[in-house]
Amino acid sequence: MSKSALDPVEFLKGALEIPSPSGKERAVAEYLAEGMQKLGLKGFVDEADNARGQVGEGPVQVVLLGHIDTVPGQIPVRLEGGRLFGRGAVDAKGPFVAMIFAAAGLSEEARRRLTVHLVGATEEEAPSSKGARFVAPRLKPHYAVIGEPSGWEGITLGYKGRLLVKARREKDHFHSAHHEPNAAEELISYFVAIKAWAEAMNVGQRPFDQVQYTLRDFRVHPAELRQVAEMFFDLRLPPRLPPEEAIRHLTAYAPPTIELEFFGREVPYQGPKDTPLTRAFRQAIRKAGGRPVFKLKTGTSDMNVLAPHWPVPMVAYGPGDSTLDHTPYEHVEVAEFLKGIEVLRGALEALAQTHAGEKEG
């Protein structure tokens, strides 16, 4: 099939029509890999069920990594009023498909200077981040772009870190008339103390530099002889508070009778504003008629997973409005999606020009 036979909007629509909740991405990975082959790229599915692609034979290694899993909850896929609706339209099949078409449209000159590796990663929406962790030791990029919705004029420099916490209190049962806090009350007191600590940390700080806390679950288990209470909460961490430092604070505030368990540790990341990669994106956005805007996100992404492994210029970029992530009306504007392809391709071309004096492969 010729390259022109694949329309980017129709191809994205096809990807949205294949459900791919975390852990069940194989079908959409095969669809995407086949599409990459039709576009003239090397396309395959790896052992982690990532959709993989490669183009170019240059010395400069560039990774374009987006995720192809979604949160649960299907949305009827439809093209309506210049908008493409579907689960993953912005988070994040849309950004990854934009990466595919940008790479497929590279000039021969850029292909001689760059080798572009495409990764449609699995299980980003799960604590495992399976796909990103699989490629982390296997690829050695000079530059990395994470496919997440930033808006076509936006360049995301960083994401907050995360820590998931489970707290448990078990104690002997006693009569409610007894003047002693029960297991549930002890956990509530602990969470109130953590809230006070976080609020003290947040004084005078912008949102990206604040500690955010969310109580996710609270349960009291009925028992005749023992009281058992459990709660689950998460913290969103600024760059000044890595997970291990947060754990020290959380442990210090906990009475010895409360059991704590920590998991889902994601290191916060914030990259510099001025690198060859950010300059390439700024140039491409302006060339497409836009005004570049740097962004910092309070959520997490595969950038948090990969930054410790790849100490190279890294940004997140992708068409779409991130406020639509996980919502029942998730959609991407078709014009925005096409602009995203144009900007990604332009950024890669600009990056190739940056390395014009280097020996080609």
UniProtKB/Swiss-Prot annotation:
Entry's cofactor comment: Binds 2 Zn(2+) or Co(2+) ions per subunit.
Active-site positions on this chain: 69, 124 (proton acceptor)
Main enzyme class: hydrolase
Domain of life: Bacteria
Protein's UniProt keywords contain Thylakoid: no
Reaction catalyzed: [amino-group carrier protein]-C-terminal-gamma-(L-lysyl)-L-glutamate + H2O = [amino-group carrier protein]-C-terminal-L-glutamate + L-lysine
Main localization of the protein described in the UniProt heading: cytoplasm
InterPro entries to which the protein is assigned, alphabetical: LysK, Peptidase_M20, Peptidase_M20A
Family assignment from sequence similarity: Belongs to the peptidase M20A family. LysK subfamily.
Biological role stated in the UniProt entry: Catalyzes the release of L-lysine from [LysW]-gamma-L-lysine.
Descriptive protein name: [LysW]-lysine hydrolase
Organism: Thermus thermophilus (strain ATCC 27634 / DSM 579 / HB8)
Gene name tied to this protein: lysK
